[in-house]
C-alpha cells in the first residue's frame, strides 16, 4: 500500500513539474485606458454587458436580503400571541 502511495506521489509531482506554463497577454494597460476614459458612463457599466448584469444581480440580492432581514426582525419583535 505504501508503495502505491509513493508511486502516486511521484506521478503527481512529475505531472505538476513538467506541465508547460501558459503565457497570458497583459491586459491591464488596455483595461486601465477603458475605465479611465471620460465618456460620461458610470464606471460600473464600462465593462460591458457582463458588468451590467453583475451590478444588477448584486443590487437585487442586496435589496432583497435587506428587505428579508427587516421582515425577520419585525417578525421576531412582534411574536404571535398564544391562546
UniProtKB/Swiss-Prot annotation:
Instruction: Give the stretch annotated as transit peptide in the record, renumbered to this chain.
Output: 1-23
List residues, modification N6-acetyllysine. 33
Listed transmembrane segments: 49-77
Name the coiled-coil region(s): none
Superkingdom of this protein's organism: Eukaryota
- GO cellular component entries: mitochondrial inner membrane; mitochondrial membrane; respiratory chain complex; respiratory chain complex IV
- Where in the cell does this protein reside? Mitochondrion inner membrane
Residue ranges in the Mitochondrial intermembrane topological domain are: 78-83
**Family assignment from sequence similarity:** Belongs to the cytochrome c oxidase VIIa family.
What name has this protein been given in UniProt? Answer: Cytochrome c oxidase subunit 7A2, mitochondrial
Query: What species is this protein from?
Result: Rattus norvegicus (Rat)
Amino acid at each position: 500500500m505504501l508503495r502505491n502511495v509513493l508511486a502516486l506521489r511521484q506521478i503527481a509531482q512529475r505531472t505538476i513539474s513538467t506541465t508547460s506554463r501558459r503565457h497570458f497577454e497583459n491586459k491591464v494597460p488596455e483595461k486601465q485606458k477603458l475605465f479611465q476614459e471620460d465618456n460620461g458612463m458610470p464606471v460600473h457599466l464600462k465593462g460591458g454587458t457582463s458588468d451590467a448584469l453583475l451590478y444588477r444581480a448584486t443590487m437585487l440580492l442586496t435589496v432583497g436580503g435587506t428587505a428579508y432581514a427587516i421582515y425577520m426582525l419585525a417578525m421576531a419583535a412582534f411574536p404571535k400571541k398564544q391562546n
